[in-house]
């Protein structure tokens, strides 16, 4: 069974791999990462937000990751770096390496394609014909890999992932349990009172270093491929419709839905439960707040929000009733302005 390993490193070991300046005892042993308020012996913590700097004086961690401007506010061992939060993430990876607990191909797996000796395939996996797996791919229990799929080196599929025929997943990706890659897009042509299914003949193409959350679904393209760019991170329960293009290093939080044929530029961020209509273009560098509904293209990068502010139910109803009358109120204001102008002219 897959798990995270446990490692003990000194501050000197960590700095040798990640950089940063060690102040204090460089041989301090570190076995865990922990929050600033609760870290203790053997733990390393970090200060990324200045509003928590008052906690440094009471911190009992063996070491702290700090920016240069606050490096002298903690008397114990510390690592000084420009981005403590990113540094913490890398330290956590060093101390908790992924261990698949698997080796070779389990006897219950059905594998219809040749695979490298370094690949690990768990029980009850099905791998179809003409599948290409890179070195050190890990496929956990119950996964289904359709014919003609390509999966790059170092990629991990957790239990019960389904990858439909012809799809491509890059190197060093993580696909969490229950994700479905390459199911049919929602394509139907109206004919009278019925609907004719449109065969979805494109693929899903996922770049390198992509993470796909649990129970996320990515539809295959209708004619062109659905593309998830390098470095993208999709949370749990995200849906990507057919023909979408998600630009490199974009991040989509849980329950986001992107309708078909929408194109995101690079480095976009969508908060949880963002709803993006189809056939739109979203400019590179755009941030969309959680719960926002986007119904037209965003051509200029920035932060966009369409969520009605939280209020008591009574106040919300009152404000909602005003919103329903906005068009009439605007007409009345326009009439009043017109009358005032007429009076000014007469006066």
Curated annotation (Swiss-Prot):
<feature type="active site" description="Proton acceptor">
    <location>
        <position position="242"/>
    </location>
</feature>
<dbReference type="Pfam" id="PF00132">
    <property type="entry name" value="Hexapep"/>
</dbReference>
<dbReference type="InterPro" id="IPR007691">
    <property type="entry name" value="LpxD"/>
</dbReference>
<keyword id="KW-0808">Transferase</keyword>
<dbReference type="InterPro" id="IPR001451">
    <property type="entry name" value="Hexapep"/>
</dbReference>
<keyword id="KW-0677">Repeat</keyword>
<comment type="function">
    <text>Catalyzes the N-acylation of UDP-3-O-acylglucosamine using 3-hydroxyacyl-ACP as the acyl donor. Is involved in the biosynthesis of lipid A, a phosphorylated glycolipid that anchors the lipopolysaccharide to the outer membrane of the cell.</text>
</comment>
<dbReference type="GO" id="GO:0016020">
    <property type="term" value="C:membrane"/>
</dbReference>
<keyword id="KW-0012">Acyltransferase</keyword>
<dbReference type="GO" id="GO:0009245">
    <property type="term" value="P:lipid A biosynthetic process"/>
</dbReference>
<keyword id="KW-0443">Lipid metabolism</keyword>
<protein>
    <recommendedName>
        <fullName>UDP-3-O-acylglucosamine N-acyltransferase</fullName>
        <ecNumber>2.3.1.191</ecNumber>
    </recommendedName>
</protein>
<keyword id="KW-0444">Lipid biosynthesis</keyword>
<comment type="subunit">
    <text>Homotrimer.</text>
</comment>
<keyword id="KW-0441">Lipid A biosynthesis</keyword>
<dbReference type="InterPro" id="IPR018357">
    <property type="entry name" value="Hexapep_transf_CS"/>
</dbReference>
<dbReference type="GO" id="GO:0016410">
    <property type="term" value="F:N-acyltransferase activity"/>
</dbReference>
<comment type="similarity">
    <text>Belongs to the transferase hexapeptide repeat family. LpxD subfamily.</text>
</comment>
<dbReference type="InterPro" id="IPR011004">
    <property type="entry name" value="Trimer_LpxA-like_sf"/>
</dbReference>
<dbReference type="InterPro" id="IPR020573">
    <property type="entry name" value="UDP_GlcNAc_AcTrfase_non-rep"/>
</dbReference>
<comment type="pathway">
    <text>Bacterial outer membrane biogenesis; LPS lipid A biosynthesis.</text>
</comment>
<dbReference type="Pfam" id="PF04613">
    <property type="entry name" value="LpxD"/>
</dbReference>
